A protein has these predicted regions:
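Short, charged/polar surface micro-motifs in flexible loops or helix N-caps
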Residues: 53-56, 64-71, 77-79
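Exposed loop/turn and edge beta-strand positions of beta-sandwich/beta-sheet ligand-binding modules
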Residues: 1, 5, 56, 89
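Beta-strand/loop substructures that line and gate deep hydrophobic ligand-binding cavities in soluble
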Residues: 78-124, 129-131
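A short, structured loop/turn motif at beta-sheet edges
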Residues: 15-16, 63-70, 94-103
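Short beta-edge strand/loop motif at the mouth of beta-sheet-based domains
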Residues: 6-7, 13, 17, 23-59, ...
Length: 153
């Protein structure tokens, strides 16, 4: 894993609530546009990200789990055929309490093709997570939103 994407955001929430939002299927469905995660989140356990209809998107193993501070996942794309051959990657979630907010740092290490895909996806997902935790309302899925140019047409 030669390349790395790092995203840092500050969310008005507690580390416990943020951990729950990252690991609880009911939470992830709300801000990840129907996607949900399944695992017991113990070190060595399998985990899976699934579409709302149950199809697999991503699978892997929980490499580290220290609630509510650190979660490290082995990450295997199962859905996009162009990315399956890019090999496994690693996603690390670090949570730190800062007064009334939690600092979330997401680091994703991957080969270039997969890294390009996740570096476009993480900002959207994490912005929606932040909105959901702070306002109770997730952002719309950017894939379903017209651009300004399309709206003007």
């Amino acid at each position: 894993m030669s390349d790395r994407f790092v995203y840092v955001t500050y969310i008005r929430t507690t580390p416990d609530k943020l951990w729950q939002a990252l690991t609880d299927a009911a939470f992830t469905r709300e801000y990840w546009w129907g996607m949900f995660l399944e695992s017991d989140w113990k070190k060595g356990s399998p985990w899976a990200m699934k579409f709302n209809d149950g199809r697999l998107n991503t699978t892997g193993e929980v490499l580290e789990s220290d609630p509510p501070r650190r979660l490290v996942l082995d990450w295997h794309n199962e859905y996009n055929p162009d990315l399956i051959g890019d090999g496994p990657s690693r996603a690390t979630f670090e949570i730190e309490q800062l007064g009334e907010m939690a600092k979330l740092t997401v680091t994703h290490e991957a080969q270039p093709k997969l890294l390009n895909a996740v570096s476009g996806g993480w900002p959207k997902v994490l912005a929606s997570l932040k909105s959901y935790l702070e306002t109770g309302k997730a952002l719309p899925n950017p894939a379903n939103c017209p651009t300004a140019k399309e709206s003007a047409a």
